[in-house]
């Protein structure tokens, strides 16, 4: 059986509230945390960590182009709550799998706070790095706010240029490390892609493995996709034009014969420099001059959000923008676009390319 633990963000819609109460104190501050179990399949369950003061807000990690200022505490509480939930199970887990900086403290806590327990001392941890550029770096005094000892402010702990890095903590303390592709596992051990952690990753390369990401070919199958207005396949593209027209309609763009004959270029992406948005910025005039329509779905750095909004305002019949994320619209764009705009600087794996 697999148990997934995640925050109950505002955008999470699931039945039930309250659940098991978990009084939790961190850095002298008390938090009222709820643990709500949600069935998710015959051998899977989801546990939602409820704490409205931390998770019931706009944006998962930030809003308005800025990180939430208390992200260290938000994800420190998540890490503690996940482990406290696991400790309360009848049977301990076979392995604890943490992802990215947001849960980088989980391996740290396993080898510090929970290391005195003879059962938990033997449970291995796996830490997966999805993107090394996002490191969860906070001021050094964050350690005390998380009830972590000052000895962790060291090269073998979380210290990173006189600050603390949750990602580095996960890399240092996990028993095994993975990335989302074999190529990325090699790349992050170089100065070009190591983001200042290449030395540590070379040191730990004996436990580092790249495992290629995948997509659910049932979910992303245009023949059966419920988000598409008509089915199609590589062998029968007849239904694709209905998806294209639906995209144009959703964005308020013309959908007459001329518009349908024009290439539709889609972009479903985080709007950040890594995705090559600086290249789009430099070439925005040439892009706007193309006899093509553009539809964009994503969020990220404010300057790139505003760039696309300005382009849409200047070319309202050919450029449409939605800032945010919409699962159904993402499927519609993937199904209806003729081309995709993907000028990424680098990709740890590249799910959209898949």
Residue ranges with predicted function:
Residues 1-354:
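Catalytic cores of nucleotide-sugar-dependent glycosyltransferases that transfer UDP/GDP/TDP-activated
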């Amino acid at each position: 059986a697999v148990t997934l633990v995640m925050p109950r963000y505002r955008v999470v819609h699931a039945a039930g509230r309250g659940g098991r109460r978990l009084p939790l104190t961190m850095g002298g501050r008390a938090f009222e945390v709820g643990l709500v179990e949600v069935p998710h399949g015959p051998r899977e369950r989801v546990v939602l960590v409820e704490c409205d003061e931390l998770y019931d807000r706009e944006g998962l990690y930030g809003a308005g182009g800025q990180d939430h200022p208390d992200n260290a505490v938000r994800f420190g509480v998540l890490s503690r709550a996940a482990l406290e939930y696991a400790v309360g199970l009848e049977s301990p887990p076979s392995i604890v799998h943490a992802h990215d900086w947001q849960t980088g403290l989980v391996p740290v806590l396993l080898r510090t706070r929970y290391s005195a327990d003879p059962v938990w001392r033997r449970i291995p941890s796996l830490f997966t790095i999805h993107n090394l550029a996002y490191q969860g770096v906070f001021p050094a005094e964050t350690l005390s706010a998380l009830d972590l000892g000052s000895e962790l402010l060291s090269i073998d702990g979380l210290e990173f240029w006189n600050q603390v890095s949750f990602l580095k903590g996960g890399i240092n303390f996990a028993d095994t490390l993975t990335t989302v592709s074999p190529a990325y596992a090699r790349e992050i051990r170089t100065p070009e892609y190591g983001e200042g952690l290449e030395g540590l990753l070379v040191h730990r390369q004996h436990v580092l493995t790249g495992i290629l990401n995948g997509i659910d070919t049932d979910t992303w199958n245009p023949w059966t996709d419920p988000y598409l207005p008509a089915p199609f396949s590589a062998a029968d593209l007849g239904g694709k034009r209905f998806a294209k027209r639906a995209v144009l309609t959703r964005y308020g763009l013309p959908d007459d014969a001329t518009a349908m004959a024009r290439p539709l270029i889609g972009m479903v992406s985080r709007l950040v420099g890594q995705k090559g948005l600086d290249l789009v910025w430099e070439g925005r005039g040439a892009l706007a001059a193309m006899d093509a329509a553009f539809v964009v779905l994503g969020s990220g750095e404010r300057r790139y959000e505003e760039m696309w909004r300005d382009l849409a305002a200047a070319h309202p019949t050919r450029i449409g923008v939605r800032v945010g994320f919409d699962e159904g619209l993402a499927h519609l764009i993937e199904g209806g676009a003729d081309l995709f705009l993907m000028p990424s600087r680098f990709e740890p794996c590249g799910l959209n390319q898949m």
